[in-house]
Amino acid sequence: MTADLALIWPELILTIGGLITLMLGTFMGDRQVGTYQLSALLTLAAAAAAAIALFGVETTVFSGTLSVDAFGGFAKLLIYAASFICILVAPRFFTGGMRAEYPTLILFAALGMGIMASSRDLMTLYVGLELNSLAAYVLASFMRSDERSSEAGLKYFVLGALASGMLLYGISLLYGFTGTTDFAGIAAAMGGEPGIGLIFGIVFVLSGLGFKISAVPFHMWTPDVYEGAPTPVTTFFASAPKVAAMALMARIVIDAMGPAVGAWQQIVIFLALASIILGAVGAIGQKNIKRLLAYSSINNVGFMLIGLAAGTQQGVEGVLTYLLVYLVTTLGAFLVVLQLRDEGGNQVESIPALAGLSQRRPGLAAAMSVFLFSLAGIPPLFGFWPKYLVFEAAVNANLVPLAVAGIVASVIGAFYYIAIIKTMYFDDKSDVEVTGGGNAVEGTIVAASALWLLAVGYLFIPALAVASAHAASVLF
C-alpha cells in the first residue's frame, strides 16, 4: 500500500491541495482571491512536476486498477496545464464574484480527469469520470445570478446523468458477460468474436464516453452549455475534459476491447463521421462566438476519432499530438473571447459585433485569425500538422474513405472560420465599441500561443514525435 501511494503523487497532491484551498476560502472569505488562487496554482504546478517525475515508470497500482505510465502522464500534463490557465485568468472575469469554490472545483475536476486517464478498471473509470462530472455541473452554473449559467448547469446535469446511466449499463453488461471489471481481464474474455451481449456493452460504454467528448449524436448539450456557462468555465470545458475523455476512450478501446476491434471500430468510425459533418455544418450561421467554438470542438473531436478509429499506434500518436495542438489553439481562442468587452465592461459574444475589430484591437484580431486558421487546419499554421497525422494513420489502416470524408469536412469547416475573419477585417465597424482590455498575463498567453501556432510549433515536431510515440507505445 505504501509503495502504491508513492506512485500516485499527482493525485495525492491534488487531493491535499484541493482541501487546503477549500479551507482557505472558508476561513479567509471571498475577499482573499489571490490567496486561494495562488494555492490552486501551486497545487497544479506541484502535481505536474510529480507527473513528470513519474514519466519513466510503467506499472500498475492498487491491484491493477490504476496505471502509472507515459500515456497517463502525457494526458495529465495537458490536463494540469489547461486547468492552470483556466484558474489563472478567472479572477478578472468574475470581478468580485470570484469564490474559493471555483479553483477548488477545478482541482477536484483535474483529480477526476487524472484518474480517468490512468484507469485500468471499469470501477476506477467511473469514479474518476463522476468526480470530474460533479465538479463540472457546479462550475457550469457558477454564476448564480445569471439565468443563462443556471440553465447551462441544469442542462448539463440532466443530460450528464443520462450519459452516466448509459455508461453504467454498458459497464454492467461488460461485467456480466466477462466476469471482471479489469481491462486486461475483459480483453482476455473477449477472445475472438464477441457475443451480442458484449457488443451491446461496448455500444453503451462508448455512447457514455461519447457524451463526455461531445461526439455526435451525444453533443446536444455542448452549444447551450458553452454559451451559458461563464467564459473561463467554457474555456475549461473545451480543453481539459476533452483530453481526459479522449485518453480514456483510447485506453479502453485498445486495452479492454482490443480483440473486438471489428465491433468498436465501426462505432468510432460512425462517431467520427457524424461529428466532423455536423460540427462543420452546424457552425454555419451561428451568431454567438461561444456557440460557434462549441461546434468547432465537436468538429475537431471528430478528427481525433479518425486517428483512434485506425486502431494503430500511429493513430494514437496522431490523437495525442492533436490533443496538444487543439489545447493550445482552443485556450488561445477563448482567451481572446475573454478579452472582448464593450464600453460598459460587458462580455461581447456576438459575431456581428466583431465587425471592424481589426481597427479597434488589431492585436486581438490578428491573434484570433491565427487561432481560427489553425482550428481549420490551414497550412502553414501548426493546426495542419495533427490533421495530417490522423489522416495518414487512417490511410495506412485502409480507412481511405474516412480520410477523404475528413478532408471534405475540413474544407466545409474552413468556411465559417474565414467568415469570422472577414467580419473582423472587411466589414464596417459595428455599433458596439469593443474595447478589449486584457491584462499582461492574458496578453502574454495569447501572444505565445499564436506564435507557437505560426511557426515555432514546427520546431518541436521531433520532440513531440518522440513523446507521443513513447506514450502511445504503452497501449500496444
Swiss-Prot record:
> Is Translocase one of the keywords UniProt gives this record?
yes
What keywords is this UniProt entry annotated with?
Cell inner membrane, Cell membrane, Membrane, NAD, Quinone, Translocase, Transmembrane, Transmembrane helix, Transport, Ubiquinone
Q: Where in the cell is it found?
A: Cell inner membrane
InterPro entries recorded for this chain?
A: NADH-Q_OxRdtase_suN/2, ND/Mrp_TM
Q: Name the residues that span the membrane.
A: 5-25, 38-58, 70-90, 97-117, 122-142, 157-177, 196-218, 231-253, 264-284, 292-312, 318-338, 364-384, 401-421, 445-465
- Which cellular components does GO assign to this protein? plasma membrane
Reaction(s) catalysed (UniProt annotation): a quinone + NADH + 5 H(+)(in) = a quinol + NAD(+) + 4 H(+)(out)
Topological type in the membrane: Multi-pass membrane protein
- At the top level of its lineage, which domain of life is listed? Bacteria
Q: Which GO terms describe its biological process?
A: ATP synthesis coupled electron transport
- Where's it mainly located? membrane
Q: Which GO terms describe its molecular function?
A: NADH dehydrogenase (ubiquinone) activity; NADH:ubiquinone reductase (non-electrogenic) activity; quinone binding
Report the EC number(s), separated by commas if there are several. 7.1.1.-
Q: How does it assemble?
A: NDH-1 is composed of 14 different subunits. Subunits NuoA, H, J, K, L, M, N constitute the membrane sector of the complex.
Q: Relate the protein's function as given in its record.
A: NDH-1 shuttles electrons from NADH, via FMN and iron-sulfur (Fe-S) centers, to quinones in the respiratory chain. The immediate electron acceptor for the enzyme in this species is believed to be ubiquinone. Couples the redox reaction to proton translocation (for every two electrons transferred, four hydrogen ions are translocated across the cytoplasmic membrane), and thus conserves the redox energy in a proton gradient.
Give the matching NCBIfam families. NDH_I_N, PRK05777.1-3
Q: Which family does it belong to?
A: Belongs to the complex I subunit 2 family.
Q: What is the protein name stated in its UniProt record?
A: NADH-quinone oxidoreductase subunit N
Species the sequence originates in? Sphingopyxis alaskensis (strain DSM 13593 / LMG 18877 / RB2256)
Which lineage? Bacteria, Pseudomonadati, Pseudomonadota, Alphaproteobacteria, Sphingomonadales
